[in-house]
Amino acid sequence: MIDKGISRVWLQHYDKEVSANLSYEHISMYEILARAAERHPERTALIFNNWRVSYRKLKVLVDLAGTNLRRSGVRPGDRVAIMLPNCPQAVISYWACLRLGAVVVMTNPLYMEKEL
């Protein structure tokens, strides 16, 4: 929420056709992924080395990971630490947690036990 008393001086630099306010549909992050998979199923969502993952495939992998997390006992509001390098599995895990309503805690995979 923007405090109406705060001056937004940058707006004076906007072109006339640029809106000062944007309205967004209130949907979950997972719903954004689901819609992308529906609208652009064959478009590339991820590239890792020479591996390309389409939005359709990403959603399938996220749903599978989410199902397994739920079976493991993860529930909405639970905190889930993801301790992976920048790789597809980190992305899939992130979206799977969001699908379940869990809170994602991204950690550095190089952390030692005392740093966690």
Which residues does each PLM region occupy?
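Flexible, non-catalytic linker and terminal segments flanking ANL/adenylate-forming cores
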Residues: 1-26
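Conserved AMP-binding/adenylate-forming core of the ANL superfamily
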Residues: 21-25, 30-34, 42-87, 91-95, ...
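Anion (oxyanion) recognition and catalysis
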Residues: 98
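Structured binding elements
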Residues: 101
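Short beta->alpha connector loops at strand-helix junctions that form conserved
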Residues: 107-109
